[in-house]
């Protein structure tokens, strides 16, 4: 493990990185939130279907 090389790599990445603008942050947040809601809704549908079918699920 070459510590000076690793530190230089990390510093180079941090220099290139920038904080997102407010619009960019809101767009990413909305997309991530929509994805979380979609996965939750799919899970709920699966649970509901499994609960309604006789002999399947709990």
From Swiss-Prot:
InterPro entries linked: Prot_translocase_SecE_dom_sf (IPR023391), Translocase_Sec61-g (IPR008158), Translocase_SecE/Sec61-g (IPR001901)
Main location: membrane
Residue ranges crossing the lipid bilayer per the database entry: 36-56
Any one GO molecular function term: protein transmembrane transporter activity
One GO term (biological process): intracellular protein transmembrane transport
Disulfide bond sites: none
Keywords annotated in UniProt: Cell membrane, Membrane, Protein transport, Translocation, Transmembrane, Transmembrane helix, Transport
Membrane topology: Single-pass membrane protein
GO cellular component, one term: plasma membrane
Keyword Zinc-finger (UniProt): no
Subcellular localization(s) per the UniProt record: Cell membrane
Family statement drawn from the similarity comment of this UniProt entry: Belongs to the SecE/SEC61-gamma family.
Subunit and partners: Component of the Sec protein translocase complex. Heterotrimer consisting of SecY (alpha), SecG (beta) and SecE (gamma) subunits. The heterotrimers can form oligomers, although 1 heterotrimer is thought to be able to translocate proteins. Interacts with the ribosome. May interact with SecDF, and other proteins may be involved.
Function, in words: Essential subunit of the Sec protein translocation channel SecYEG. Clamps together the 2 halves of SecY. May contact the channel plug during translocation.
NCBIfam families tied to this protein: PRK09400.1-6, secE_euk_arch
HAMAP family: SecE
Protein name as catalogued: Protein translocase subunit SecE
């Amino acid at each position: 493990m070459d510590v000076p090389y690793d530190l230089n790599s990390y510093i180079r990445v941090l220099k290139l990185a920038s904080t997102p603008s407010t619009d960019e942050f809101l767009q990413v947040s909305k997309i991530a939130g929509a994805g979380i809601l979609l996965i939750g809704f799919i899970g709920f549908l699966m649970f509901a279907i499994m609960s309604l079918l006789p002999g399947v699920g709990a």
